Design a protein with these regions (language model features):
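Unchanged
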Residues: 52, 66-169, 174-175, 179, ...
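Short amphipathic alpha-helical segments enriched in hydrophobics
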Residues: 11-18, 35, 53, 194, ...
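Basic side chains
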Residues: 47-48, 167, 185
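Short, contiguous, pocket-lining structural segments
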Residues: 23, 178-182
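Entry/capping segment at the start of metal-dependent catalytic domains
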Residues: 1-24
Length: 202
């Protein structure tokens, strides 16, 4: 059974993991935010606004973004970006732990990007305040039951142009949205960390 207690126990060993910026790299962080409403554990997602120059334009993502020179750690990036994008002060909640960093290599990125995903928990009353604040970056905020992400009934495919041709990618559908790509890969890291397999795999 997927529960907050399971997530806490699985990620507790990651809390003290050395989480710093490596030299000569471009960094970004995302926040996988959990809340519990009516006994159901839910996850926060955003749909990015359609924006020229954004490699993930219009895609479903976690709140987060790139590090600035003033950011002291990956967690600081995730917390600042979440506050700016959707108005949630997740630093007032519980930082459960970190997922493995990912190095993202894309032709449309000037430099490789090191992504740090961090898992948080906030109370439901605070979660209700989530709303797009930066409309030029975030089009929509929504919550998905964690169990939904592990249900094979919602596995789908999405067509996306890459390398001059349309390719099919696995995803998870929810109320007209499709969670796929980098966000799905982060979810896979989460599933591996908690020891529960996901039916949708990249």
């Amino acid at each position: 059974m997927l529960s907050l207690e399971l997530v806490r126990a699985a990620l507790d060993s990651q809390k003290l993991e050395r989480s710093v910026f490596e030299p000569n790299a471009t960094h970004a962080s995302v926040a996988m935010i959990l809340t519990r409403r009516g006994g159901v554990l839910e996850v926060c997602f955003i749909r990015r606004a359609e924006r020229e120059g954004d490699p993930w334009s219009g895609q479903v993502a976690f709140p987060g973004g790139r590090a600035s020179r003033l950011d002291e750690s990956p967690a600081h990036v995730a917390e600042r970006e979440t506050r700016e994008e959707v108005g949630l002060d997740i630093n007032e909640g519980e930082r459960i732990g970190s997922l493995p960093q990912r190095v993202i290599e894309r032709n449309d990125l000037k430099n490789n990007l090191t992504l740090s995903p961090i898992v948080y928990y906030i109370e439901s009353k605070k979660a209700e305040k989530a709303t797009p604040l930066q409309k030029e970056e975030v089009a929509h905020v929504f919550w998905v039951p964690l169990a939904h992400l592990f249900n094979e009934d919602f596995v789908t495919e999405i067509e996306y142009p890459m390398g001059g041709q349309l390719r099919n990618f696995p995803g998870i559908k929810h109320d007209g949205e499709v969670i796929w790509g980098l966000t799905l890969r982060v979810l896979q890291s989460f599933s591996e960390a908690i020891g529960v397999s996901m039916p949708a795999t990249c």
